[in-house]
A protein has these predicted regions:
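Conserved P-loop NTPase
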Residues: 127-186
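Conserved H-loop
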Residues: 110-113
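Conserved P-loop NTPase nucleotide-binding/switch module
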Residues: 56-100, 104-105, 117-142
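Active-site lining segments that contact anionic ligands and/or coordinate catalytic metals
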Residues: 4-6, 61, 170
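P-loop NTPase switch/communication element
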Residues: 2-41, 77-78
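Short, flexible loop segments at the rims of nucleotide/cofactor-binding pockets, characterized by
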Residues: 40-44, 87-90, 107-108
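C-terminal amphipathic alpha-helical segment
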Residues: 37-40, 46, 63
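Conserved alpha-helical scaffold flanking the Walker A/P-loop in AAA+ ATPase domains
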Residues: 44-57
Length: 186
């Protein structure tokens, strides 16, 4: 049970992308590849997930459903050590964690993110639910306390960025490919 405009977001290595403005997440690609009208026949995990987010916003979704198990790690997060090794000016990906609050503040888009390996999301979460033997428990207060004890320097990223209005072609939304669901034989 959820909103009727909720969209499941995942990485889809190898998918085709046609003229999607992924610049909110991806910039400064090699060979000056355009990210304001990004096109490829063979997207990486991070570019496909960025495109999936933007396409969901383009169709008016106000709720993104994300599971870290089906996400591109480098799209979702960059830890402090990696930020020190590869400085922002050399990294083309702005991770989702750095944009999720602005996405809500500027566009009213909420995100439900299932994570089991990244406590960094405690810093940006409004609510933290932990599954304890398949029973959901609100652990927001505990998570916020943990986050405050392990404070990190947040990098200012500015605004979320623009969402370009496009006309989606029906053929670009065909449900064929390696993720097509097949009914089992009975």
């Amino acid at each position: 049970i959820t909103r009727d405009d909720a969209v499941k977001i995942r990485a889809e290595d190898g998918r085709s992308i046609e003229k999607v403005n992924i610049s909110s997440f991806i910039n400064n690609l090699p060979n000056n590849k355009d990210t304001y009208q990004f096109s490829t026949e063979n997207a990486s995990g991070s570019t496909s997930q960025a495109a999936n987010v933007i396409e969901a916003l383009e169709i008016g979704s106000k709720l993104l459903l994300i599971d870290e198990d089906t996400s591109a790690t480098n799209f979702m997060i960059r830890d402090e050590r990696m930020k020190k090794l590869v400085v922002k000016s050399k990294e083309p990906i702005t991770p989702f964690i750095d944009k999720v609050r602005e996405l809500y503040k500027e566009h009213g888009v909420s995100s439900i993110i299932v994570v089991g390996g990244s406590g960094d999301y405690f810093d940006v979460a409004d609510r933290v639910i932990m599954m304890d033997e398949y029973i959901p428990k609100d652990v927001t207060e505990q998570a916020k306390k943990i986050a405050s004890l392990d404070s990190k320097e947040q990098i200012e990223v500015g605004t979320f960025g623009s969402i370009t209005k496009r006309v989606l072609l029906k053929s670009s939304l065909e449900l064929t490919g390696k993720y097509t669901k097949i009914k089992p034989k009975e």
